[in-house]
A protein has these predicted regions:
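DNA target-recognition domains and sequence-specific DNA-contacting regions of bacterial/archaeal
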Residues: 47-48, 56-57, 61-191, 239-243
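Non-catalytic DNA-recognition/assembly elements of restriction-modification systems
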Residues: 1-78, 83-95, 189, 193-235, ...
Length: 243
């Protein structure tokens, strides 16, 4: 029992350490995004013009979220807990706000952004629940699945939505919902393509480190959930893990 506890404690310590690292990386990316696309610091020497979203650099335009995001919602498919219970724990199974389980097959393969569609869709500040995901995974139908398009990288899309107040487009008195139609009501500023390409190159290294930390946490979660019950029951000895 003591060995199992120390094993669990070790996994949790590494898990939370990686979480803190990723929180810091997210803050770095968000600060850079704010500097470029909220405060317009690199463009202050140029002319600003009025728009629906206030003053923006000349040559930029106002669009909506689906001008820069491609949706893959039609590919989603929920799996019941009964369907998942006998599956090997290999690929993440995502819900509206987090990994719900691991399964032995996948629908998506690549880098995507998930945004809660119904149930839990925003925090108390009105910001959307987002999950930056990558690799092979499965998603149920409670999260919109999207990627950046038109020279907006998925990483840039993530930065844009992190601090975007979406409360005006959320519907549902009993259960909150963000429909695809209402996603078009999320207005965004679109800079020229060359600017989005340069910015994406600046934040890509930050997200690569984030991916590395997240992969380690997924591995730790699987080890925790599969090995610890065996350690607790005595079916597995600590020497078996070390070997």
């Amino acid at each position: 029992m003591q060995i199992a506890y120390h094993t669990y404690s070790s996994y949790q310590s590494l898990f939370h350490k990686n979480r803190r690292k990723n929180d810091n990386l997210e803050q770095q990316a968000q600060a850079l995004f704010k500097s470029w696309f909220v405060d317009f610091e690199p463009f202050k020497d140029g002319k600003l013009v009025d728009s629906e979203l206030g003053m923006i650099p000349e040559g930029w335009r106002v669009g909506n979220l689906l001008d820069i995001a491609k949706l893959y919602d039609a590919k989603r498919k929920p799996l019941s807990s009964r369907e998942r219970e006998n599956m090997k724990k290999i690929y993440p199974y995502y819900g509206a706000t987090s990994i719900m389980d691991y399964v032995d097959k996948y629908i998506f393969d690549g880098t995507y952004l998930l945004m809660g569609e119904d149930g839990s869709v925003m925090d108390d500040k009105g910001y959307p629940y987002l999950q930056y995901v990558f690799g092979k995974f499965w998603s149920n139908n409670h999260a919109h699945v999207m990627q950046g398009k038109n020279n907006f990288s998925t990483e840039m899309l993530h930065c844009l939505l992190l601090k975007k107040n979406i409360s005006p487009i959320v519907t549902g008195a009993v259960q909150a919902k963000i429909s695809q139609a209402n996603m078009r009501k999320i207005l965004i500023t679109q800079p020229p393509h060359e600017i989005t390409i340069i910015f994406s190159s600046h934040i890509k290294p930050i997200y690569e480190i984030r991916k590395k930390n997240e992969l380690e946490n997924q591995r730790l979660s699987i080890l925790r959930d599969t090995l610890l019950p065996k350690l607790m029951s005595g079916k597995l000895k600590i020497n078996d893990i070390n070997n």
